[in-house]
Amino acid sequence: MKRPLDFKLYVITGENYHPGRGMLEVMEAALRGGADIVQLRDKMSPKRELIEKAKRLKELTAKYGVPLIVNDHPDVALAADADGVHLGQDDLPIEAARELLGPGRIIGISTHRIEQARAAERAGADYIGVGPVYPTGTKPGRKAVTTAYVAQAAAEIGIPFVAIGGITETNAEEVLWAGARRLCAVSAIVGHDNPESVCRNLLGKINAWHLGEQVALAESVSLSVPVSLSAPMPAPGDVREIDVVVNGRSERTQAATLLELAAEYKLEGRSVIAELDGAVVPRQLWGETPLQGGGSVEFVHFVGGG
């Protein structure tokens, strides 16, 4: 049975970024630093050599209890007993890969616009890559999707997504601010003299956002009076009206939760991010986030393909 997919820092191999140092040496440093999912990406090696690399890397990742994903090749993933495969848009369809791999292995796919993300989710992908967020040498010539697409994915996609492409210690917080909660890096980690240190730093930033999001969400519902996420909702049949500010305009509403307010504005099924008093509220928590009088809500709706 496939275990639930839960990761924060995704590291991809890139042997061209560390000449003179072996792949296993570099990847073990990343694992010591907290990488919790690893991908073998090698576009040049013959298939037999790729299988041997995957087997050696699988031994290493297994020691740390971390999944190994193989880029592009479901057959290599099977031969090396890897945990899954990562596909590109021009690779084998997700459904065909699932037929080969069975239900117990992970299937991820790169996406570059929201339509591809929606299609991947419908097809049964376990996670998607969102990028490249910034220009990157790993994908030369590929137009950056910017953090706007990250925000769209955060607003709409229900399966895990990982932001990738040009992400560094310097810009990671910008990507997290846009809504990513999982980051992927190649050159910034494996091309660094100290991959372990970079991983610890990036993971620290991710963890800070996870913790800060929980605290901010609890504080964001403290509007006119202190309340918590467990604050009682109005009893069924009770009708109350409150004044809130929605996208800069004062409005009177009977909505008890952020989800009900979104429904009043007919935002169901649309690519929307919601902020309550300046804090982004994850979409899955809208239904349990109570509204109080005097609050300020911002709905940001994304149009187009990212």
Give a label for each model feature.
Residues V130, A163-I167, A185-S187, G305-G306:
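Glycine-rich beta-strand-to-loop/alpha-helix junction loops that act as flexible
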Residues Q152, G158-F161, G166:
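Catalytic-face loop-and-helix region of soluble metabolic enzyme cores
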Residues A178, R182:
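C-terminal binding/interaction regions
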Residues A216-S230:
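Compositionally biased, low-complexity segments
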